[in-house]
């Protein structure tokens, strides 16, 4: 029994939800998202709530039940509040700058790294922090992971790009014999 799937999703004011067959359509202002639920999950809209239930008692239907409820909830939260991830840059000479729709990173390589910002994502650079914001949780996480991947933090000095809430396990350096 899915504990997540059982919970109804309250539709906040300003968000329109339509159900067309297996397709859930969400809209708030000029933002619109769609969620294609599989045939083995029932979706109902009752009393300003979205309810999910499995069609069968097989394992696959129960697995999709909680998954699609979580995906729909993330869409509702993304349309109303949005998602954000914060990255920190540590290291001498490491810096980031925005140039239009391109994020330019200087991370100790012989050349700057230019990262094209995808649509629907807003990036704010403030000194050594990069804030990635957007309405799609998956895309925000993916963009933050791609930026971190250019120079992941190393365990000796902690230089590199890391999430603001990430803890780096530090290692001791070499010791000399005496």
From Swiss-Prot:
The keyword rRNA-binding applies. Keywords: Ribonucleoprotein, Ribosomal protein, RNA-binding, rRNA-binding. SUPFAM superfamilies: Ribosomal protein L6 (SSF56053). InterPro entries: Ribosomal_uL6-like, Ribosomal_uL6-like_a/b-dom_sf, Ribosomal_uL6_a/b-dom, Ribosomal_uL6_bac-type, Ribosomal_uL6_CS. It comes from the Bacteria. Signal peptide: none annotated. PANTHER family: 60S/50S RIBOSOMAL PROTEIN L6/L9 (PTHR11655), LARGE RIBOSOMAL SUBUNIT PROTEIN UL6M (PTHR11655:SF14). Belongs to the universal ribosomal protein uL6 family. This is Large ribosomal subunit protein uL6. It comes from Campylobacter jejuni subsp. doylei (strain ATCC BAA-1458 / RM4099 / 269.97). The lineage of its organism: Bacteria, Pseudomonadati, Campylobacterota, Epsilonproteobacteria, Campylobacterales. The gene is rplF.
